[in-house]
Amino acid sequence: MKTVALKEASSILPKYWPLTMFVHHNPLHELESLHFKQALKIAKDLFDAKVYMDPSYYVDLYRKGKVRKDSLEKNIEEFLRENNFNFNKYKVRKFLTDISPSWKEYKEESFNNPSIKVPDYLLEYIKKDKGYDNLDNLFYTYIKKYLFSEILDILFDQNIYNVFFNDAVEFISRFLDEGQTSITLPFREQGYWNCFRQFYKLDKHPEDIIEEFENTFQPPSLQDYARQLYIRFFGWSSFIKFRESTPFYPYQEEFPINLEDFGSSLLYLENQYIQELNKSKIKNYFDLMAFYKENKYYVILKLFEHRKILTPKYISKLYTSKDYDNIFNKFINEEIESEAKAIVNLSTKVFDKSDYLQTYNLVKTLKEDEECYLWIKSLEDSYALNFGREFIKEYQIDEKPKAFAVFCVDVRSEALRRNLERVDNYKTFGVAGFFGVKMALIEFDKAHELLLCPAMEIPDKVVLEVPTQKTQDYEKRKKLLISLKKILEGLKNNPYTPFFAVESFGWLFGYKLFGKTLFPSVVAKIDKKIKPKPPKTFYMIDKLSEKEVDTYTDKFFYEKIYQAFEKEGIKIKDCEVKDILSKLKNNENISQNYQKVLNRYRITKQYYDYIYNRFSNIGYTLDEQVILAENFLRLIGMVEDFPEFVLLVGHGSVSDNNPYESALDCGACGGNSGYHNVRAMCMILNKKEVREKLSIRIPDGTIFIPGLHNTTTDEIEFYDEDLVPENSLDKWEEIKKDFKKAGEKTRIERLSSLPYADNPEDVIVRSIDWSEMRPEWGLSKNLGVFVGKSESRINSVLKNRFFLHSYDYKIDVDNSILKRILNGPLLIAQWINAEHYFSTVDNEKFGSGSKVYHNVVSRIGVFSGNYSDLKIGLPYQTVYVEDRPFHEPIRLIAFVEAPLEKVVEAASQTDHPMMLVKNEWIRLVVIDKEKNKVFLFSNGNFVEL
């Protein structure tokens, strides 16, 4: 089947989650089976992207002392040995620090120095090595990187590709729309291909389209061509991959799509626009080869121009002269001579060598692959050594803690934890932000599930939020706000009513736009008064009985069937609905007319079974709750000496006019706030029946209180405070004051890194200011994970750069706890780290560019301007400040406090984490306090630091 080639081509795509549940991910996830360095080499070629920062960036860090000289020299020595280069490591270091960052200028200076003489053998060697002696190879290498429409545009200054691209984006964005536009694409419910086919009046299947494209254009490899096609639509394709691989995603159920159909539609559109707009005589790859053979120098020069290889002087000549042979030869001779002179200069003045070929090969190897990898490894090694020496120190705390506080591992919790520990004697813990409760929660006023767990998992339990107070006032206010919002959105998304919108509702737009930009604090207070206050609620965490499951499922489907017929304008009696439901459940025949309605609304036996299963999964049995509680407490080493108050503090963020708000929430909660998870775990841990069955003794007087850390403002709010007994209220108020002090200290600390923030109030104002592009730094500057006891880092100032997960290896007899940490929180941290890395090194390719040009599209993501690929990474403002990187792009460094043998044994019993460590996507450091030694995994072995 022809679609197999498309399926294989799409295998390099990652998944991209929608903005509403933004999940940090590695854009090179499908290359993680390769070593980090090899994967980056492939990605550089495949995506035409940068995969490291420029050498000058690393040299700047070296000059600031962040890269240790001994680490750099050790890695230079290793590099020289592995590549059989006989050079002095100190002289190579001089080249890396003093010459390489300005290599282009060094070549120009050398070229203009008449005293430098170059032997002919060096010129010939460079010419051959760069492929300038074999134009055919150059041509074949380059054309594989382009679509046929792009080649026609490059060679003949046409605009076919842009027209094709914009049309494809227009269609796919409308098909994938999740409620942004008020003018929906017809036939979406029939699936992508049927919708596309009817829209473009086609009577063909994907197989036919692929075969037609192949016959028309004769590409050298259909699979390679399709891969380039998916890369041009990288964001859209990655979102489709998420859609087709996510069971029961509502929009995928309603409007199904797959990558093979999408790829086929792109082949069709490109074919159509080439036929319509191509003014050249080149109709296929056969014609292209013939044209190349007759116009070799012209073709190569045009490709050089497009790839920014040709210098401005020769670009000008390309358009003012047709002597392409002469232009090409002059250009490459100049390039070769400047390179050769620089090599001779370098050999003589820096390396004291007359073996120019060896110097050339050294520089070539460094410049092509090794230089920046050597820098990044040296930077990581420096951090590993510096922090390893910090964490190996032992600190003893004898005073009884005032309270325990458990936070998410998120880097933004580090400063708050540190400041709380210094305000008074608090013992803090870190755990993945779902707090041991993976659940799908249905809020009392919502009709959909929130998946509150890491993105790589699907929760098998459903929890319902149920109000304990009357909700009439809340519902009344909420309906008013929703109605107003719908009116405004309807006007905004209808292209023919902007005038009406301004005339009728200009005052309201003005209130929001100017108020939230010029007077954000005032507007926030008004909004707070208008916004309905939700009623008190509790969670239905106890499992439903079989009878309740039957009843609720039948009621659900009764309503669904009744509403389906009502929408179709068909009157149906109660007894008929019950009869249809009975037949549906028992797989009996239903009349054809009724069946048509059921099919249209996807009311099937399969869906009934799914809903029945979801109702069956509501809540946990008592034994399941005991297991959740036991696992949670042992995971973080909280097994004894419980104080009266144990605070479980999740985190979320609040910012206005920010499409990426979900990215600032909790990654372990699927891009949602951790509020629900901490409440659920507190309810479980406070249950008398649960405590009675635990093997860990929790005193009767110990209370678990849920809280939420707003990472944008560092304010902490607590919930369910009615659990606090009257005789403990004074102590509780004191604890809340301590948290407030810690939050204030954290805000002041963050001021120094936030641009244009002069006082702590500015931090709060940023969260409600519509014009603020950087409400907080989020997870930028993340560096590593520390897995161990809080005592080991209690005197360290980690500046919100570490994910902190509590772990006590002494209670982890069978390594099960460490394996859970490696398989869960470590992987989440690696996804976050990788996304920040690639969004920094090439923000246009792997990030999402500047927020200034962002437009939300289809409510699933953003694109730049009116048409672009769906942007899959982080905005420029998240990782850069004033044209300088704020985030330091390095691999995640995982520090694990445990005996070396224990870590090796646990890691070897995992699959993906072990692969990431072996392939050095994660740098693993072991803090072995029993040996009083620190070990780093490097090049397949643990080495002592």
Swiss-Prot record:
UniProt-listed InterPro entries: DabA (IPR018752)
GO molecular function, one term: zinc ion binding
UniProtKB keywords: Cell inner membrane, Cell membrane, Membrane, Metal-binding, Transport, Zinc
UniProt-annotated binding residues for Zn(2+): C408, D410, H651, C666
Cell compartment(s), UniProt: Cell inner membrane
CC cofactor: Zn(2+)
Cross-referenced Pfam families: DabA
Cysteines engaged in disulfide bonds, as pairs: none
Top-level lineage group: Bacteria
GO cellular component, one term: plasma membrane
Function: Part of an energy-coupled inorganic carbon pump.
Membership in a protein family: Belongs to the inorganic carbon transporter (TC 9.A.2) DabA family.
Subunit structure: Forms a complex with DabB.
PANTHER family documented for this protein: INORGANIC CARBON TRANSPORTER SUBUNIT DABA-RELATED, UPF0753 PROTEIN AQ_863
Protein name in UniProt: Probable inorganic carbon transporter subunit DabA
Taxonomic source organism: Sulfurihydrogenibium azorense (strain DSM 15241 / OCM 825 / Az-Fu1)
